[in-house]
């Protein structure tokens, strides 16, 4: 199932420059080369396998997994795969309190529903051009920020995060709520608070694509 050559081909083994490393990633680093840390792909594969087994257990119980990736090179990849497996995702800015204060999110969802009803019952058509413009802007803003989590009625059973350093607010909320995290961790990340850390290049779109494909495949084949 896992082919080391595939990981090498997409550059999953390339970490950051040695000056940017996090010492807690030491056990996942194979060597230094040209001033860059090289990740031990055998450990990457081992961690992906562990994460996939965990995912299968979650999906078999009918629970939801939230995907999080707001960095440019990961957004489209993650949203496409999340849609494929019918799971919620966040690829725009993480709004503080998305998990720890879901009541705020529900208020935003209510606003979206009100706008939808106004368009159905004809109220929207009776508005002035300026009012319509303001309503449309609000709807687009809410849709962009909330996206697919508008249908998430309860906390996810797990959160998959691309770049745990960038998504530190999401990580903190998951920790506070004891929600397990599966995270792609590069050599500049701290893996200690990640339940299922996957050591790999989190800057390469090809590396991200390969890893997310394995994780989502474990949902499809469950």
From Swiss-Prot:
Keywords: Ribonucleoprotein, Ribosomal protein. InterPro entries: Ribosomal_uS2, Ribosomal_uS2_bac/mit/plastid, Ribosomal_uS2_flav_dom_sf. GO terms for cellular component: cytosolic small ribosomal subunit. One of its GO terms (biological process) is translation. One of its GO terms (molecular function) is structural constituent of ribosome. Belongs to the universal ribosomal protein uS2 family. This is Small ribosomal subunit protein uS2.
């Amino acid at each position: 199932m896992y082919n080391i050559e595939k990981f090498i081909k997409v550059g999953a083994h390339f970490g950051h420059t040695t000056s940017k490393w996090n010492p807690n990633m030491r056990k996942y680093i194979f060597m230094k080369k040209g001033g860059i840390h090289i990740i031990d792909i055998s450990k990457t594969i081992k961690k992906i396998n562990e994460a996939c087994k965990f995912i299968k257990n979650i999906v078999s119980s009918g629970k939801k997994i939230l995907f999080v990736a707001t960095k440019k090179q990961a957004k489209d990849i993650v949203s496409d795969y999340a849609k494929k497996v019918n799971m919620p995702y966040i690829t725009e800015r993480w709004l503080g309190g998305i998990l720890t204060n879901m009541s705020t999110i529900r208020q935003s969802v209510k606003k979206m529903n009100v706008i939808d009803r106004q368009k159905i019952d004809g109220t929207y058509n009776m508005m002035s051009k300026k009012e319509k413009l303001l309503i449309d802007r609000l709807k687009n803003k809410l849709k962009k920020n909330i996206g697919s989590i508008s249908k998430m009625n309860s906390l996810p059973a797990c959160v998959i995060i691309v770049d745990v350093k960038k998504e530190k607010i999401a990580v903190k909320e998951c920790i506070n709520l004891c929600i397990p995290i599966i995270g792609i961790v590069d050599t500049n990340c701290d893996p200690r608070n990640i339940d299922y850390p996957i050591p790999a290049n989190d800057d390469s779109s090809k590396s991200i694509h390969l890893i997310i494909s394995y994780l989502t495949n474990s949902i499809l084949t469950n």
